Amino acid sequence: MASLENLVARYQRCFNDQSLKNSTIELEIRFQHINFLLFKTVYEALVAQEIPSTISHSIRCIKKVHHENHCREKILPSENLYFKKQPLMFFKFSEPASLGCKVSLAIEQPIRKFILDSSVLVRLKNRTTFQISDLWKIELTIVKQLMGSEVSAKLTAFKTLLFDTPEQQTAKNMMTLINPDDEYLYEIEIEYTGKPESLTAADVIKIKNTVLTLISPNHLMLTAYHQAIEFIASHILSSEILLARIKSGKWGLKRLLPQVKSMTKADYMKFYPPVGYYVTDKADGIRGIAVIQDTQIYVVADQLYSLGTTGIEPLKPTILDGEFMPEKKEFYGFDVIMYEGNLLTQQGFEIRIESLNKGIKVLQAFNIKAEMKPFISLTSADPNVLLKNFESVFKKKTRPYAIDGLILVEPGNSYLNTNTFKWKPTWDNTLDFLVRKCPESLNVPEYAPKKGFSLYLLFVGISGELFKKLALNWCPGYTKLFPVTQRNQNYFPVQFQPSDFPLAFLYYHPDTSSFSDIDGKVLEMRCLKREVNHVSWEIVKIREDRQQDLKTGGYFGNDFKTAELTWLNYMDPFSFEELAKGPSGMYFAGAKTGIYRAQTALISFIKQEIIQKISHQSWVIDLGIGKGQDLGRYLDAGIRHLVGIDKDQTALAELIYRKFSHATTRQHKHATNIYVLHQDLAEPAKEISEKVHQIYGFPKEGASSIVSNLFIHYLMKNSQQVENLAVLCHKLLQPGGMVWFTTMLGERVLELLHENRIELNEVWEARENEVVKFAIKRLFKEDILQETGQEIGVLLPFSNGDFYNEYLVNTAFLIKIFKHHGFSLVQMQSFKDWIPEFQTFSKTLYKILTEADKTWTSLFGFICLRKN
């Protein structure tokens, strides 16, 4: 692509080219992304200025010819004359506010008559030409294109619609005579009519801006805004590919900057205690970048805010990241990108922060209302000290703004790779959605109307790659709301469908709400209540500061991952006290030590082998899924839909976190759609079954398989629990569906205790190098295995030396109950039978498998049952 200056120079040379003396030389400016509303806006603006105009009608037949040199010619018969139109050069303005504006240089030459065939494109044109000066004319054209069989079928009808209107066409009545509902194309072109030698590139830019200002009075401001983002990006990004996304407008400010992550308990556990981190308050402002560029001082946020000038002398650039209060024009800096020409993006935050205050002082020197956010460096792991640190920031009364949370900043990483987390009280956790009114007449039961409410659908942004890896589908009505071109992008809107609440994207908006025109807007919303099959949402505010990001076509509210991880704080609330003491209820928080390596590898191998038996099934339910230890195995098996059920909210939150981790770091041949249900499996089977069947898309006939790995001992307290489990499995499975249990075998445990003469409250131990590796504490006195209710204490690899109590599983009784409820036993097998296969799988791990490991593994087995 040529530069604009080169194109203008080539245009001028064409008039001295003797080979072109019989050609018409055209320099045109075309706008490529024109819809009816934009067309009408420009048309009416030109009419209002009473600019001289003429109306013309034409029918042109076009035949496109492609040569070996890839030069395209258009052959155009007009008034029985035949021409070929050959493009020579073009220049395209890159800024998105220019609506794909393109400057084209072409020549038109007369040729001999050619044969019209079915490949010819027929274009009917209704054109109004406005001669805005001696140098330029603006042509606004309504076009109908016909091809092939359409020509004979529709040509006469559209000729009547476009040309033979009931009234004589004038510029003033044109837009009322043409029906915009028909599938017309709309073109705006500017043609140069002045002396070739007088034209400059600046003239082209000026006339282009004139038309764009008719479309949007803020065009020049939008152009300046985009140029400011480009300036910032040039100091942050090194990748030409990413810089091109900024220049094209596909990325706006939000996609450029590193985002603050909503912190979950699982996030916090990874670095608790947060020694070395920096903490500051979170203000309820908008993200903004303060810039000193030459003599200009401005903030780039939802728009461009000019804060003044430095005077005559230009300064070296300073770029600060922070929060901006537009009403008061106050800037609160929390990071620095560049200070007086020194790029700091590769330094750790602990170094960057030293220049942040210096940058703030530069702003203050020019009477800008700016200050550095107050940071505390966390140096102690003592919970009491941490509590005082957090309270001193969060509960401070002297800040000039309302504090709605805390920010934790990780040291040691570059600007783009610095992990920054925000913590908010549950009430202040909000999400940003692109809101669209639900199309009518969809006949979707889940979209049932409610009197006094209008149904809207909530959308967030997602990459095409993540969309595929999470096996998501577009909701009913999606194709009516978003054009095909948008759906084919690398980043597009998707309904907000978290794993634990697939219908969370439904929002019933009260007709009496003070928020009226919300369709197509980005709204900040909070969850008031989670009901059986929908969420009660409350609008906090319309994100007017995000409208410009929305126009880029690359922003649709929060990113899907960000939104779901924020949503976890409704599912598993994170209290202020837990910041100091550490998250409570973390599921099996202890880590396994190296001595368990071979034994845990063996158990993992066995579970992998079992799950592979159900590979590629459509719907699978995991009872007691915990934090998703088997998630990778389900993904490897290509399960299409996985429903995980557990009563531990914190464990389920960790599972969802793992869902995204697998999607971004591991490669799987098949995608799995993951649903989670927070549910105590000891509750009545009927209630649980109803909840599962309410999961969006769950088949009426039931799932293909139910899996429960090392969980059912929790449901062996009494026979009623076992009966309830059997009923639940029957209700959730399709006929012929399978149940797969792995469990510690009660019969084998009792045998081990008898062999070693372990009495009540005594402990059987297996040691390795004088370290207790496995242990079972006998908590019952009966000598024979009871149907239910016999407890033992178990020392687990991840229990940090503590015993976990569980019930012995009487497998004979379990199978008996399942048979009574319509199941047949397919297979029962001890884990020890897999040891030879494990040796083949990994000779290295098998060699370090000890006798204690083998003894412990022999206590476990699996049971497979089929629903009759």
Curated annotation (Swiss-Prot):
S-adenosyl-L-methionine binds at K607, G624, D646, L710, F711, I712. Induction: Expressed in the early phase of the viral replicative cycle. Gene3D superfamilies: DNA ligase/mRNA capping enzyme, Vaccinia Virus protein VP39. Its EC number is 3.6.1.74, 2.7.7.50, 2.1.1.56. Keywords: GTP-binding, Hydrolase, Methyltransferase, mRNA capping, mRNA processing, Nucleotide-binding, Nucleotidyltransferase, RNA-binding, S-adenosyl-L-methionine, Transferase, Virion. It is found in: Virion. The active site is at K282. PROSITE patterns: RNA_CAP0_MT. Signal peptide: none annotated. InterPro entries: CYTH-like_dom_sf, mRNA_G-N7_MeTrfase_dom, RG7MT1, SAM-dependent_MTases_sf. GO terms for cellular component: virion component. Residues 594-868 form the mRNA cap 0 methyltransferase domain. Pfam families: mRNA_G-N7_MeTrfase (PF03291). One of its GO terms (molecular function) is GTP binding. The record marks K627, R658, H713, E806 as: mRNA cap binding. Part of the viral DNA-directed RNA polymerase that consists of 8 polII-like subunits (RPB1, RPB2, RPB3, RPB5, RPB6, RPB7, RPB9, RPB10), a capping enzyme and a termination factor. In the N-terminal section; belongs to the dsDNA virus mRNA guanylyltransferase family. In the C-terminal section; belongs to the class I-like SAM-binding methyltransferase superfamily. mRNA cap 0 methyltransferase family. The N-terminus contains the mRNA 5'-triphosphatase domain, the central part contains the mRNA guanylyltransferase, and C-terminus contains the methyltransferase domain. This is mRNA-capping enzyme.
